[in-house]
Amino acid sequence: MSHKILELYSGIGGMHCAWKESGLDGEIVAAVDINTVANSVYKHNFPETNLLNRNIQQLTPQVIKKWNVDTILMSPPCQPFTRNGKYLDDNDPRTNSFLYIIGILDQLDNVDYILMENVKGFENSTVRNLFIDKLKECNFIYQEFLLCPSTVGVPNSRLRYYCTARRNNLTWPFKRGDEIITRLPKDFGVPHSLESIIEEDVDEKFLVPDKILRCAKVFDICYKTSKRSCCFTKAYTHYADGTGSIFTDKPREVVQKCYEEANQNEIGSEKFVELFKELKLRYFTPKEVLMIMCFPKSYNLPTNISMKQCYRLLGNSVNVKVISELLKILFE
């Protein structure tokens, strides 16, 4: 059976890539996002797709039914469910478009499959309860997940909430119950090392600047042999702590020795910074972050997109591998 898919909050097309990666039969009938920069990247990679630059609340049930889609893939704004977003939940206007979709779901009787992604924390929200209640009301069976890319063999930490749902009249052998699943049944083994995604001869513009080197004590440093990396956020390269890992070609022993020497100097001092400069610490390039997030090698970012824009878009995107595995389960 060939499926017709509506991709909401399409961003740079992570869900589209995941659908292709899954090997399932179907096409993205329409993709919708209000972010013009994200849309330019999407169009660059998927020029044939019907991409709409508009507010999702402008999509009437009649328009969606006219497309005859049977599947909705979506990643609604996550800020209302984060600490930085003050956990405003349904009081945050950024939830309005998703609340609108929840509100019209009972009119979309042509839709049989749904996959939704959001940040960890969504599972405790009022919006989640409204979403789940509506799924039940519309005769969907659902399964919730909290999954990290490391559980599917990817060397990255990016814990996210996922919900897959399908109509109750469709037999679904996977359904596990009401508990949130944190591991998939398939064993993906330990994550591979970062070596395969590291670019050679990287431009010096990716070196960590002196003002950030002053905060080197909080860096999460990765090596070619590392089988892990921290979650890359949209603030990557702007803040030192908690926005993503830093890379060095130097051996661990050299880095360790540098930290030992640096500890004998005042944190942030000139000598402190000089010691860390010797490590040639650099940011992961946008291409490397794309690879860590499992985008295909053929995927690329247009040259007219600034570095800041690249990292912001990547920080808001999804892990392609995790989504593709969930799609296989959803359509099992």
UniProtKB/Swiss-Prot annotation:
List, alphabetically, the Gene3D superfamilies matched.
DNA Methylase, subunit A, domain 2, Vaccinia Virus protein VP39
The record's EC number reads 2.1.1.204, 2.1.1.37
Task: State the UniProt keywords alphabetically.
Answer: Cytoplasm, DNA-binding, Methyltransferase, Nucleus, RNA-binding, S-adenosyl-L-methionine, Transferase, tRNA processing
Q: Which residues form the SAM-dependent MTase C5-type domain?
A: 3-332
Q: Which residues cross the membrane?
A: none
- Pfam families, A to Z: DNA_methylase
Instruction: Provide the binding site for S-adenosyl-L-homocysteine.
Output: 12-14, 33-34, 55-56, 75, 79, 97, 316-317
Record-linked InterPro entries = C5-MTase, C5_MeTfrase, C5_meth_CS, SAM-dependent_MTases_sf
Question: What catalytic activity is recorded?
Answer: cytidine(38) in tRNA + S-adenosyl-L-methionine = 5-methylcytidine(38) in tRNA + S-adenosyl-L-homocysteine + H(+); a 2'-deoxycytidine in DNA + S-adenosyl-L-methionine = a 5-methyl-2'-deoxycytidine in DNA + S-adenosyl-L-homocysteine + H(+)
Principal localization reads cytoplasm
| A GO term, aspect molecular function | DNA (cytosine-5-)-methyltransferase activity
Q: Where does this polypeptide localize?
A: Cytoplasm; Nucleus
Q: Where is the active site?
A: 78
GO BP terms, alphabetized: methylation; tRNA processing
Q: What class of enzyme is it?
A: transferase
GO cellular component terms, A-Z: cytoplasm; nucleus
SUPFAM superfamilies noted in UniProt: S-adenosyl-L-methionine-dependent methyltransferases (SSF53335)
Instruction: Spell out the PANTHER family in the cross-references.
Output: TRNA (CYTOSINE(38)-C(5))-METHYLTRANSFERASE (PTHR46098:SF1)
Protein family per UniProt: Belongs to the class I-like SAM-binding methyltransferase superfamily. C5-methyltransferase family.
Q: What is the purpose of this protein?
A: Specifically methylates cytosine 38 in the anticodon loop of tRNA(Asp). Also has DNA (cytosine-5)-methyltransferase activity. Shows affinity for both tRNA(Asp) and DNA substrates.
Its recorded name reads tRNA (cytosine(38)-C(5))-methyltransferase
Q: Which organism is it from?
A: Spodoptera frugiperda (Fall armyworm)
